[in-house]
Amino acid sequence: MKKLIILIFSLLITFNVLANDWPHQNISKAVFALDIKDRAPINIIEELDNSLGKIYFFTNIRNLQGQRVTHRWIYKNKVMADVVFDVGGPRWRVWSSKNLWPTWIGVWSVEVLSADGEVLYQKEFNYNK
């Protein structure tokens, strides 16, 4: 019995450590990338040169099956796009993309919203000259 309790305690600590590495309790990964291949982000970035006109936002969603999430693209406090996803399983990978004009330089953000509009996570990137 003592060994079982130690095992359970160890597993709980391990899970807690892993969960704390996630950006949000329901988001295990959220990154900007230059491309998506085989449902995975390729060339993860934090900023983008304005000679490149497209960026992807990839999110690995956990334990929200049956719910909807939205990627909301924001530039200069203006909503530029909402992309809605239906989450079909306990681990669901989604991504959206945005075509960018070279003049739209500055800080962009993407919010990951729950179905009721709660911001689950927000991430920024710089679009530079």
Listing of model-derived features with the role each one plays in the protein:
Residues 1-4:
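Positively charged n-region of N-terminal signal peptides that target proteins for export
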Residues 66, 103-107:
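Extracellular Ig-like/FN3 beta-sandwich strand-entry sites
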Residues 71-75, 112:
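Conserved aromatic beta-strand anchor motif in extracellular beta-sandwich/beta-rich domains
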